[in-house]
Structure formats: structure tokens, C-alpha cells
UniProtKB/Swiss-Prot annotation:
The modification 3-methylthioaspartic acid is found at residue 102. Coiled coil: none annotated. Belongs to the universal ribosomal protein uS12 family. This is Small ribosomal subunit protein uS12. One of its GO terms (cellular component) is small ribosomal subunit. SUPFAM superfamilies: Nucleic acid-binding proteins. Residues 1-57, 118-137 are annotated as: Disordered. With S4 and S5 plays an important role in translational accuracy. Interacts with and stabilizes bases of the 16S rRNA that are involved in tRNA selection in the A site and with the mRNA backbone. Located at the interface of the 30S and 50S subunits, it traverses the body of the 30S subunit contacting proteins on the other side and probably holding the rRNA structure together. The combined cluster of proteins S8, S12 and S17 appears to hold together the shoulder and platform of the 30S subunit. InterPro entries: NA-bd_OB-fold, Ribosomal_uS12, Ribosomal_uS12_bac. Keywords: Methylation, Ribonucleoprotein, Ribosomal protein, RNA-binding, rRNA-binding, tRNA-binding. It comes from the Bacteria.
Amino acid sequence: MPTINQLVRKPRKSKTKQSDSPVLNRGFNSKKKQFTNLNSPQKRGVCTRVGTMTPRKPNSALRKYARVRLSNNIEVNAYIPGIGHNLQEHSVVLVRGGRVKDLPGVRYHIVRGALDTSGVDGRRQGRSLYGTKKPKN
């Protein structure tokens, strides 16, 4: 336990918060072939592999994911939300931050209804997150 005098001389430092999705905070200058500090809310990428993964211990399912090479040349695993999808290799997708708690190594989500990703068919509630248009009736 430090004394008051020690704290006056050298105050406590607050910890710097690390990003939950660090790959979105890096750009790539292809002309200079170097990374830049470029924060972005989403990034475009190309699917290199689409598959399923089993979740951690108490849960059981086949969760859909895609391995995506982003525009800054970094590869990440991204979760495909919703029921059914049209993604395959070489599909162009939009990736946002947000981890999936029971899938190890998946820290990103694919945005449904953007670029090559279709929205979820037959979805009536919570359509905004799944890229579904308003039904005509």
C-alpha cells in the first residue's frame, strides 16, 4: 500500500482500454505496403472459407461461420447470423465487430443484406439486424 506522499509524487495510471475488434482499427496502404491507423466501423472482405463450427461446452449446435480476408489483408473468422445464408467462397461481405460468446476465435459478425450477403427470408420481427425488407401486406 503506497503512502499519500508516494501517490503525490507518482499518481496511479489508469489502464488503457483495448479494442474488442482490433482488426477494424487498421488500414493498409498498398502503395507503401504498410499498415495505417484507420478506425472504421465495418470493413469489406472476401470469403475464403465457409463452414460450421461447434460451440463451447454447455451448448450444442452447428454455428455457421466464414473465414474472411479483409481489405487490409488480414484474415478473420466471422459469424453468419440468422437462419440460412447464400455465402460461398469468393463472396464479398461486410464485416462488423461483435464476438460470439460460445465460439472460440470468432470476434466479428457479417452484416446481412449488404454486398453479396442476402437478408434472412421470412423474417418479420427484428428485421433490421438481418437485412430483411418490410413485407408487403
